[in-house]
Amino acid sequence: TLYFGNNVDNHVHAHDTRTGKRKWSFAADGSVRFAPVIKEGWIYFGSDDGHIYCVDAAKGTQIWKYRPGPSGEHIIGNGRMVSLWPIRTGVLVENGVLYAAAGIFPYEGLYIVALNAKTGRPVWVNDTAGDQAWGLQYGGMAPQGYIVASSDTVYIPTGRSMPAAFDKRTGKFKR
């Protein structure tokens, strides 16, 4: 099965690789900009609607969803409604923990999260990351891109700037 997100129709699709036929589609309420992650029969991804989703890979049904941002506020971006705290990073799932980042405007707040991959419940949340990485005088940190990690650090991509590093166990900003 081939799984892919679509930033035009707001869906994650599953297609049979032999026939090309669609098995299922799951609709988010915003663009799905990054490839989903598949682990142990579940699919994880983020959306411009500000939610992180967990979907059953076989059925395409939602298992859980989590909103890192403080509210469901939306703005217009490129002619579409977008959360003030969209998920503009890929998600990373390691050892039963999902890592993601929400937000594009540092002055509105950014949210770096570690969630229990099975339940969607927070392991930790860093809600002070907006000006930590480079300071607001340099534009702050705006998470964009794929997250990577080492044994003790989660690296959040920040578009054109250097990635920001966070302690994998606590979420505390490192550098």
PLM regions with names:
Residues 1-4, 10-13, 21-28, 61-81, ...:
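Aromatic (tryptophan-biased) beta-strands that constitute blades/sheets of beta-rich domains
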Residues 165, 170-173:
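Short secondary-structure boundary/capping segments
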Residues 1-12, 26-52, 80-113, 136-163:
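Repeat-blade elements of multi-bladed beta-propeller folds
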